[in-house]
């Protein structure tokens, strides 16, 4: 039976019921709905609606119900209840009789669903924080294991300057740390309870909403009943954090997809995260990474859909807001899966140090070092830049790397170039000069690795 049937003399059309009902997806809020109901029953005792004995019976019944749905949440879906709130209430009435009908006193589904959703977001957020940390740990471990590997750095997908594999991996550790911080911020902002706000104007019972909030694990209660039932900022914020983090993961995936190509050959993916072709027996496709890249659009699209659902929506609850859950659930599930899959990819990733070194030494990646050498000889950088550009054109024509040009060839472009130029063009010298904080010098990368290992261990411990 619908919770609102008394007003109606005609039953709902079956097509409308199917269109309107949300149990098929909001059943995922069962644990949170029961948790909130347990706290609400205690609050009703304090205002004289329930006796302590009645609350005890409800508590016992809800504990049994909670254990049941934790063991088999799919059981909920065989019901024809409109939503998870209706299902929980019906289950309680079946367990304790008319006493179950008293539980909804002073409460609306509007503040109830807002509370359930926030409780779910808090729990899911903690899982996501753990998955971000696990991926960061995987990146740091991979960086440590391949610390010696030199990697060509790219701009515009053209070889630019040499970096190291460890420096590359640590770049994603930094991106993920910002994601971690943004998620923490979003979780902090949503950590207020709307329960007790009623449909929109507040409850008619003198509920201690602060105590109620603390009982459910919130930091406090919301301040305005109308805002509380209208608010879905936390949904949008979490979807935004997911979208941005997925964008970072898509860049990580694209880098490794490119590094894994036959043309690059910098890394080899494990058989465990790749698949083959039904036609071409030689193929080993980076499906895990391609799916991470592809699923980014799915998560970003969910955020855009939620924003459009909220656009120009009048205050208080409107049925449009039922559209918040499917997109949120899917976005956070997808983000969680992709974080875990990225960590799995790293476990058995092999770095081909010989190929990365050869690539880093090619493409005139030491041209900037020659320009810096000329600056040290007193030539203004802009002029030095022009001289080196002409030198590179010549080197390409004669098919030589810069370090193999003779002094005579160098001096065709600048008479200040002497034999001391050659040590400056060596790859390790190129790395060693990047000693400023955040640079690619070996000691800087080691310091960054130690720092990341330290704070990740502290967080995990």
Curated annotation (Swiss-Prot):
Its EC number is 4.3.2.1. GO terms for molecular function: argininosuccinate lyase activity. It holds the Pfam family Lyase_1. It comes from the Bacteria. Disulfide bonds: none annotated. Belongs to the lyase 1 family. Argininosuccinate lyase subfamily. One of its GO terms (cellular component) is cytosol. This is Argininosuccinate lyase. It comes from Aeromonas hydrophila subsp. hydrophila (strain ATCC 7966 / DSM 30187 / BCRC 13018 / CCUG 14551 / JCM 1027 / KCTC 2358 / NCIMB 9240 / NCTC 8049). Pathway: Amino-acid biosynthesis; L-arginine biosynthesis; L-arginine from L-ornithine and carbamoyl phosphate: step 3/3. The keyword Repeat does not apply. Its main location: cytoplasm. The lineage of its organism: Bacteria, Pseudomonadati, Pseudomonadota, Gammaproteobacteria, Aeromonadales. It is an enzyme of class 4 (lyase). It is found in: Cytoplasm. Keywords: Amino-acid biosynthesis, Arginine biosynthesis, Cytoplasm, Lyase. CDD domains: Argininosuccinate_lyase. One of its GO terms (biological process) is arginine biosynthetic process via ornithine. InterPro entries: Arg_succ_lyase_C, Argininosuccinate_lyase, Fumarase/histidase_N, Fumarate_lyase_CS, Fumarate_lyase_fam, Fumarate_lyase_N, L-Aspartase-like. Gene3D superfamilies: Fumarase/aspartase (C-terminal domain), Fumarase/aspartase (Central domain), Fumarase/aspartase (N-terminal domain). It catalyses: 2-(N(omega)-L-arginino)succinate = fumarate + L-arginine.
């Amino acid at each position: 039976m619908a919770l609102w049937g008394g007003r109606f003399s005609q039953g709902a059309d079956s097509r409308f019921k199917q269109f309107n009902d949300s149990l098929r997806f909001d059943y995922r809020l069962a644990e949170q709905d029961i948790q909130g109901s347990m706290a609400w029953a205690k609050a009703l005792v304090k205002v004289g609606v329930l006796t302590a004995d009645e609350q005890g019976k409800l508590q016992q019944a809800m504990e049994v119900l909670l254990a049941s749905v934790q063991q088999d949440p799919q059981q909920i879906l065989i019901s024809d209840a409109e939503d998870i709130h209706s299902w929980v209430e019906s289950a309680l009435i079946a367990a304790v009789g008319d006493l179950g009908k008293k539980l909804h006193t002073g409460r609306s589904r509007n503040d109830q669903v807002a509370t359930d959703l926030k409780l779910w977001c808090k729990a899911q957020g903690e899982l996501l924080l753990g998955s971000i940390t696990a991926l960061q740990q995987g990146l740091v471990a991979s960086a440590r294991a391949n610390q010696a590997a030199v990697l060509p750095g790219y701009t515009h997908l053209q070889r630019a300057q040499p970096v190291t594999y460890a420096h590359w991996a640590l770049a994603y550790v930094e991106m993920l740390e910002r994601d971690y911080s943004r998620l923490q911020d979003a979780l902090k902002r949503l950590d207020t309870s709307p329960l007790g706000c009623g449909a929109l104007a507040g409850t008619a019972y003198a509920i201690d909403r602060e105590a109620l909030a603390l009982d459910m694990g919130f930091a406090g209660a919301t301040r305005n009943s109308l805002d509380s039932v209208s608010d879905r900022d936390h949904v949008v914020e979490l979807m935004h954090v997911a979208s941005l983090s997925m964008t970072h993961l898509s860049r990580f995936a694209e880098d490794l997809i490119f590094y894994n190509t036959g043309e690059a050959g910098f890394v080899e993916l494990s058989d465990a995260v790749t698949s083959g072709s039904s036609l071409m027996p030689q193929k080993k496709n980076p499906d895990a990474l391609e799916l991470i890249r592809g699923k980014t659009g799915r998560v970003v699209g969910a955020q855009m859909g939620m924003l459009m659902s909220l656009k120009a929506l009048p205050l208080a609850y409107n049925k449009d807001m039922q559209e918040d859950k499917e997109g949120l659930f899917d976005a956070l599930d997808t983000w969680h899966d992709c974080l875990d899959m990225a960590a799995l990819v790293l476990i058995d990733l092999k770095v081909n140090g010989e190929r990365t070194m050869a690539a880093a030494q090619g493409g005139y990646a030491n041209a900037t070092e020659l320009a810096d050498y000329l600056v040290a000889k007193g030539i203004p950088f802009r002029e030095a830049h022009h001289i080196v550009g002409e030198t590179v054109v010549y080197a390409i024509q004669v098919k030589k790397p810069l370090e193999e040009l003779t002094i005579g060839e160098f001096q065709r472009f600048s008479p200040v170039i002497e034999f001391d130029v050659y040590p400056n063009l060596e790859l390790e010298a190129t790395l060693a000069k990047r000693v400023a904080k955040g640079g690619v010098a070996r000691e800087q990368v080691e310091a960054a690795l130690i720092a990341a290992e330290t704070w990740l261990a502290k967080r995990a411990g």
